[in-house]
């Protein structure tokens, strides 16, 4: 079982998501908590992939064509940190 930690800033973003995206995010959390990032790779719709550049070390999963979850796996210890849920804006703020 994987633990999901939502960063303080990401909680604000999550609370302001449209209902459809919020439901998809909850489904994403269910999959990750049960089978981890490998479970996301088996579902093509999430298009889970590693990021490069200033987000190196993080991963991105697609919630729909516009919204992404940016997260990081900490020390392979079944711990996922959600850093950002964004409408495809990858700039660090």
Label every model-predicted segment.
Residues 4-8:
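PIN/NYN-family metal-dependent endoribonuclease catalytic core
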Residues 9-43:
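N-terminal first-folded block
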Residues 34-62:
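A short, surface-exposed loop/turn module that caps and links secondary-structure elements
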Residues 1, 11-16, 20-22, 61-93:
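Enriched for short, Lys/Arg-rich terminal
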């Amino acid at each position: 079982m994987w633990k999901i930690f939502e960063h303080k800033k990401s909680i604000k973003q999550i609370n302001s998501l449209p209902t459809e995206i919020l439901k998809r995010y909850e489904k994403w959390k269910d999959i990750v908590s049960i089978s981890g990032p490998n479970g996301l790779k088996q579902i093509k719709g999430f298009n889970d992939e590693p990021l490069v550049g200033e987000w190196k070390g993080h991963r991105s999963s697609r919630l729909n064509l516009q919204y992404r979850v940016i997260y990081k796996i900490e020390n392979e210890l079944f711990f996922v940190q959600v850093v950002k849920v964004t409408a495809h804006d990858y700039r660090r703020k």
